[in-house]
Amino acid sequence: MRHGVAGRKLGVTSSHRAAMFRNMAVALIKHEQITTTLPKAKELRPVVEKLITLGKRGDLHARRQAYAQLRDDVIVSKLFSAVADRYKARNGGYIRVLKAGIRHGDAADMAVIELVDRDVAAKGQDSGPRPEAAAEDSLAA
């Protein structure tokens, strides 16, 4: 019996699940809206909500905890500056999960997961190297 066992396995190993949620959390903070399957979106919500709460705390220990989870300096900086400032007055409920129909290939329930009061300009942001880094590299060469 599995009484009181929380969370979904999603058909993958625990290490795969951890990596998947890390990648999805980084993508959600970067683009502020992503499309995924409904069970993954529902499992991702508490992960990102806790990260935003860490960003609101803003101290060094919280920053190190967020970096241990996300492993991306740029995203941690965005989390602790822009995202944390946006939700200073809000106590939880930073994430919205909307149903988005079914996927035609396998009839999986799809969902859009997004930050509440999101920045619309962040969606579709370049996933490649940052323009600042490219400019620095060209100046150094």
UniProtKB/Swiss-Prot annotation:
Molecular-function annotations in GO: structural constituent of ribosome
Gene3D superfamilies per record: Ribosomal protein L17
GO biological process entries: translation
Keywords, sorted A to Z: Ribonucleoprotein, Ribosomal protein
Assigned GO CC terms: cytosolic large ribosomal subunit
SUPFAM superfamilies cross-referenced by the UniProt entry: Prokaryotic ribosomal protein L17
Family: Belongs to the bacterial ribosomal protein bL17 family.
PANTHER family: LARGE RIBOSOMAL SUBUNIT PROTEIN BL17M (PTHR14413:SF16), RIBOSOMAL PROTEIN L17 (PTHR14413)
The protein's assembly and partners: Part of the 50S ribosomal subunit. Contacts protein L32.
Listed name of the protein: Large ribosomal subunit protein bL17
Species this chain originates from: Gluconacetobacter diazotrophicus (strain ATCC 49037 / DSM 5601 / CCUG 37298 / CIP 103539 / LMG 7603 / PAl5)
